[in-house]
Curated annotation (Swiss-Prot):
PROSITE patterns recorded: ZF_PHD_1 (PS01359)
CDD domains: PHD_OBE1_like
Stated name of the protein: OBERON-like protein
Native source organism of the sequence: Pisum sativum (Garden pea)
Name of the gene encoding the protein in the UniProt record: PVIP
Keyword Nuclease: no
């Protein structure tokens, strides 16, 4: 396959470094409400979901940060052991189905998917997948590669590797190790010409899938270095594939990338026994040394390796011509060769048609995924709209209640002011009536006392008068008796003013102000 085919199959996103935010301050959470990663991996989905709804967002972020630290493995074997325990707990459960996971809390689902896949990208705040996508990834119905996200099996592949390997995606994962990365336009990956499965070059070398074999084009003749696909057991030529990669991608590589790619080619053709493979191996080693020692720049090395491929093609053409020039071709053999050329052309046309059909299916799957994503977003937007309308109606109801209470408060304040004024008026009336009654009582009391004093004075006057008349009759003409009579007479007539004054001074009631 060419580099364009590689780029079509591999994801073109670079592997970005993830900067995690600093841990934020967490509000105090009681020990009874706390949740650990072991609780999430072990307890029922609905129980953990209910507990998570009562926890603050800061605590949930702390849970995700803790799992990210474990997945990073910064603490060595301790973190690896913790992750294996969590993964074993999750993968041994039979209750984690689509029916139960649909009711899971968002953070709970992200943590479960990260534990099951071992990928911390699902915990990153800038990556937001729909709940449906997360459930499909957990159940191995969607590719766990965030940059791929194809439905599984990809391209409806019916190979045993795709149908039996849970979560395997033939568009972005290695057939042997089932891992993916973001390397494109490189000899790090080897693609199968027939099944379009991909394999790491390192994995293929380790599993001895790169070896000498018969020529792929003719099926006979001199052997060459070939790659045997583990998924379909078919073989693919390596020299032509390496040449296509270098012709399409080498001009854009820098010095370090070129050294790395030359190293891959050297390792691929290390065990080659044909002349072309050995020449390529020797030339790659020579160019690597020159690049490392700064004796040649990357552009010159790129031109040199491309020249090597041209020379190898020329040598191959000459060797074939020399081999065929020594004998005459029979008519039947000529017809067979023509038929082979036609069949090869038909095979290539069918391959191109199949490739276009796979690309069409992939595009259709991508469109369907986008439609589902849009439907999910529309449903979420509808839920948010309903929630917003509900909140708006609640706010309006609260505002109406507040206005009603304010009106009641104003009314009660008005009545209180009126009652206060009425009480003050009644108090003034009561004080006025009290003062008037006191004055009347005092006047009547003084009049009564004055009448009593007058009556007593009149009584004494009459009594003295009678006594005087009796004494005059007994002793007429006595001067001392006449003097006593005049004193008593003065005392009676001068006494009432003093009595009135004493009665006023000794009156027990208060005077008017």
């Amino acid at each position: 396959p060419t580099a364009d085919a590689i780029a079509a199959k591999k994801m073109e996103n670079g592997k970005a470094a993830i900067d995690f935010p600093d841990q934020s301050v967490i509000r105090r959470v009681s020990s009874a409400d706390r949740i650990s990663l072991q609780d999430i991996a072990r307890e029922r989905v609905d129980v953990i979901c209910d507990r998570m709804h009562r926890l603050p967002d800061e605590f949930l972020d702390e849970l995700k940060n803790g799992l990210r630290a474990i997945l990073e493995g910064g603490n060595g074997s301790q973190h690896r052991d913790e992750f294996f325990i969590l993964q074993k707990l999750v993968q041994s459960r039979s209750d984690l189905t689509a029916k139960t996971l649909i009711r899971a809390h968002r953070v709970q689902l992200e943590i479960l998917v990260s534990i099951n896949t071992g990928i911390q990208g699902f915990l990153h705040p800038s990556i937001s997948l729909s709940q449906t996508s997360l459930i499909e990834i957990f159940l191995y119905k969607r590719c766990r590669n965030i940059a791929c996200q194809n439905q599984l099996p990809a391209d409806e592949c019916s190979x045993d590797t795709c149908t039996n390997n849970n979560g395997f995606c033939n568009l972005c994962m290695c057939v042997i190790c089932s891992k993916f990365d973001f390397e494109v336009n490189t000899c790090r990956w080897i693609g199968c010409d027939l099944x379009s499965h991909w394999t790491h070059t390192d994995c293929a070398i380790r599993e001895q899938l790169i070896c000498m074999g018969p020529s792929v084009k003719s099926g006979s003749g001199p052997s060459e270095m070939v790659f045997r696909c583990q998924a379909c057991s078919x073989t693919s030529x390596l020299l032509g594939w390496v040449k296509d990669v270098f012709q399409h991608c080498a001009p854009s590589w820098d010095g370090d990338a070129l050294i790395r790619e030359l190293d891959f080619v050297s390792r691929i053709f290390h065990g080659s026994k044909d002349q072309r493979g050995m020449n390529l191996f020797w030339k790659c080693d020579d160019l690597k040394e020159k690049l490392k020692s700064r004796k040649m720049d990357s552009k010159a090395a790129c031109r040199a390796i491309l020249m090597v491929f041209q020379e190898l093609d020329l040598d191959n053409s000459k060797s074939l011509e020399n081999a065929e020039s020594g004998r005459l071709i029979a008519p039947q053999e000529a017809c067979n060769r023509i038929a082979e050329v036609v069949q090869e052309a038909i095979r290539k046309m069918e391959f191109v048609a199949d490739e276009k059909m796979r690309m069409f299916k992939k595009a259709r799957i991508a469109v369907e995924a986008c439609d589902r994503e849009l439907a999910d977003k529309a449903r979420e937007a509808g839920d948010l709209k309903v929630e917003r309308q509900k909140k708006k109606s609640q706010i309006e109801e609260l505002e109406r209640i507040v206005r009603l209470k304010n009106a009641e408060a104003d009314m009660f304040q008005l009545k209180a002011n009126e009652a206060k004024r009425e009480a003050e008026r009644l108090q003034r009336i009561a004080l006025a009536k009290s003062d008037k009654s006191e004055e009347e009582y005092t006047s009547n009391y003084l009049k009564q006392k004055l009448s009593e004093a007058e009556a007593e004075k009149q009584y004494l006057y009459e009594k003295i008068k009678l006594q005087e008349s009796s004494r005059l009759s007994q002793s007429s003409g006595d001067p001392s008796s006449m003097l006593m009579y005049s004193k008593i007479h003065d005392l009676l007539y001068n006494g009432p003013p003093k009595a009135d004054s004493q009665s006023n001074d000794c009156h027990p009631f208060r005077t008017n102000p």
